[in-house]
Curated annotation (Swiss-Prot):
Protein name (database record): Small ribosomal subunit protein uS12
Family: Belongs to the universal ribosomal protein uS12 family.
Modification 3-methylthioaspartic acid, positions: 89
Single GO molecular function: tRNA binding
Residue stretches spanning the membrane: none
NCBIfam families attached to this UniProt entry: rpsL_bact
Gene behind the chain: rpsL
Organism for this UniProt entry: Geobacter metallireducens (strain ATCC 53774 / DSM 7210 / GS-15)
Annotated coiled-coil segments of the chain: none
Assembly: Part of the 30S ribosomal subunit. Contacts proteins S8 and S17. May interact with IF1 in the 30S initiation complex.
UniProt keyword list: Methylation, Ribonucleoprotein, Ribosomal protein, RNA-binding, rRNA-binding, tRNA-binding
């Protein structure tokens, strides 16, 4: 516990807020190249095969990122755009791939929540 004098001399240090997506380096999105595309199983109460890609970003950092939506066209050397946002049941996956940009194609036959999956408006 500091004395009043110590507080007047030095003051209190403010706590630094920790980022949930440090690899983005405070950018909204980052471009990267897929180094590996694979499926993983989620944590305990859930069961599925979640689609994940390992991506090397333009700043040299390599991260795991989730591929949302039904079906995808990504493979090794695909150029993708990445945004923050973790997947709760996949440990270590803190980023999402943005569908419908660069090499990532939007979800086919998507009627609702189209903007989240890069789907065009159906005719």
């Amino acid at each position: 516990m500091p004395t009043i004098n110590q507080l007047i001399r030095i003051g209190r240090k403010s706590k630094k807020e920790k980022s949930n997506s440090p690899a983005l380096k405070s950018c909204p999105q980052k471009r990267g190249v897929c180094t590996r595309v694979y499926t993983t199983t989620p944590k305990k109460p859930n069961s599925a095969l979640r689609k994940v890609a390992r991506v090397r970003l333009t700043n040299g950092i390599e991260v795991s990122s989730y591929i949302p939506g039904v079906g995808h066209n990504l493979q090794e050397h695909s150029v993708v755009l990445i945004r923050g946002g973790r997947v709760k049941d996949l440990p270590g996956v803190r980023y999402h791939i943005v569908r419908g940009t660069l090499d990532s194609v939007g979800v086919k036959d998507r009627k609702q929540a189209r903007s989240k999956y890069g789907a065009k408006r159906p005719k």
